């Protein structure tokens, strides 16, 4: 019986590499994003299911999993790759409402997705829930307070869930991406190729 994967927060870079790799390994693929029009080419390429979802919205996430259950079956692997940071980073310039929205997407959305995934995976006592973190979740940098809050919270969520769910057969992992992922917006930075990162995710899922 083939496995399935749900990737939440799909865009260029790592999410696309993950989707392609999973498809090449025989997994059924579902992709979720606030803007699915940008996924049209990828959808056709790998025959993926695509769903509109604001990961910080309780109803959206609940509906996403119901739709995924019907289309590709309950996912064996769920990857939370959504994150957000405001345009302005200085603490005195940050808008509180935009700050809250960013934290909700980066951290609270991860909780909502993990909760729905765990409800399903616990029934069969297997599955993987993966979170994409960043160096900002380990070390807070100047002018990056909002991103740091979200990513620190994400790391704490992952650690707690790993201890709670591992005894029941569910694999929870948090990946710290310590560098800039190679994509069009990366500029001239030294970058990490997303295909190589994607291989690590799938290897860990199959351990």
Predicted feature locations:
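Active-site loop of short-chain dehydrogenase/reductase
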Residues: 3, 74-75, 121-133, 167-170
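C-terminal helical subdomain
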Residues: 167-207
């Amino acid at each position: 019986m083939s496995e399935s994967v749900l990737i939440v927060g799909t865009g260029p870079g790592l999410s696309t590499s993950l989707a392609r790799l999973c498809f090449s390994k025989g997994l059924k693929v579902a992709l979720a994003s606030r803007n699915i029009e940008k996924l049209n080419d990828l959808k056709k390429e790998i025959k993926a299911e695509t769903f509109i979802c604001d990961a910080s919205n309780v109803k959206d996430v609940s509906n996403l999993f119901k739709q995924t259950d019907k289309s590709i079956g309950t996912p064996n692997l769920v990857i939370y790759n959504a994150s957000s940071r405001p345009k302005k980073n200085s603490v005195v310039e940050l808008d509180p409402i935009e700050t809250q929205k960013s934290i909700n997407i980066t951290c609270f959305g991860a909780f909502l997705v993990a909760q729905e995934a765990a409800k399903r995976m616990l029934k069969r006592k297997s599955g993987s829930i993966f979170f994409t973190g960043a160096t900002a979740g380990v070390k807070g940098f100047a002018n990056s307070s909002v991103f740091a809050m979200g990513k620190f919270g994400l790391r704490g969520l992952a650690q707690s869930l790993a201890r709670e769910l591992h005894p029941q057969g569910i694999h929870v992992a948090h990946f710290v991406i310590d560098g800039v992922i190679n994509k069009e917006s990366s500029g001239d930075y030294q970058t990490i190729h997303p295909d190589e990162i994607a291989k690590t995710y799938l290897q860990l899922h199959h351990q």
